Amino acid sequence: MEQPWPPPGPWSLPRAEGEAEEESDFDVFPSSPRCPQLPGGGAQMYSHGIELACQKQKEFVKSSVACKWNLAEAQQKLGSLALHNSESLDQEHAKAQTAVSELRQREEEWRQKEEALVQREKMCLWSTDAISKDVFNKSFINQDKRKDTEDEDKSESFMQKYEQKIRHFGMLSRWDDSQRFLSDHPYLVCEETAKYLILWCFHLEAEKKGALMEQIAHQAVVMQFIMEMAKNCNVDPRGCFRLFFQKAKAEEEGYFEAFKNELEAFKSRVRLYSQSQSFQPMTVQNHVPHSGVGSIGLLESLPQNPDYLQYSISTALCSLNSVVHKEDDEPKMMDTV
């Protein structure tokens, strides 16, 4: 059955009895117990598997969503031309139609590539050595170790300091609440927040907390979109997150559809990966306490590679410069209350 929108989670609306029971014993702000080490290199295998899963997340997102957002912009431009008389109207209309046609072709090409990647993932799902295969470019591994260590320390320190606020943001369900919370805490608009939420999704699914995973996945994709929008527009993320919420609340055609599609795709990939053998050692051998899911203690067992972080949060909204330039009243500096 198709999931309702917004996705199920700890909403203010009445919840099913099963959902309430599932989340009733969940501490939103748990302590941070250390995750026990796996024997025989199991932790390293688990971490490497998480890295590959996040690499695939970037590949899927960049291939599908980028085309959809570009297509939405081209269609908006095409529609606006019909409302304005101009000597070159026919010429501009032809150019816009050509752009739409080209983007549709690119979208179809990416869709075929995405289907091929899904099939390959399913074929390798239960392979015991799947996580050690060279599925993607390994250039991210051969980075300067000193820089990696510094970035790891910075990322870990941020998540330790603001863990409760990140988790609070993850539990918000309304657009207005999320925007208001980020306005009050603009420092949370960063890659570390997106990374934390993504990892939290994997562990919630491993603990069979599907409804809560869907809620956190929604907020993880929100942060991914905001970060990529800022990156492509070359502005501070804290200065453009209102533009994202503006489009989300208005449910602008094309843009909102791309967000919903990516959210569903991300949740599907989380479920698929949690079934793979690369995820089993942590969930079966360690018996991770359910109160520690998503905590810093658990995250410390996962890879903190800066390129892994980049791969996790690099979703595609690839040509939003034109959109931002249209918003004359949108500040290109830190967003304030």
Curated annotation (Swiss-Prot):
GO terms (BP aspect): protein folding; protein stabilization
Report which residue ranges the record marks as coiled coil.
Answer: 84-122
Q: Where is this region: Interaction with Hsp70?
A: 267-337
Answer yes or no on keyword Ion transport. Answer: no
Instruction: Tell me yes or no: is ATP-binding among this UniProt entry's keywords.
Output: no
A Gene Ontology cellular-component term: cytoplasm
- InterPro entries given in the database record: Cdc37, Cdc37_Hsp90-bd, Cdc37_Hsp90-bd_sf
Q: Which residue ranges are recorded for the region named Self-association?
A: 2-171
Pfam families cross-referenced by the UniProt entry: CDC37_M
Q: What is its quaternary makeup?
A: Self-associates. Forms complexes with Hsp70 and Hsp90. Interacts with CDC37, FKBP4, PPID and STIP1.
Family in the record: Belongs to the CDC37 family.
What protein name does the entry list?
Hsp90 co-chaperone Cdc37-like 1
- What organism is the protein native to? Homo sapiens
Organism lineage reads as: Eukaryota, Metazoa, Chordata, Craniata, Vertebrata
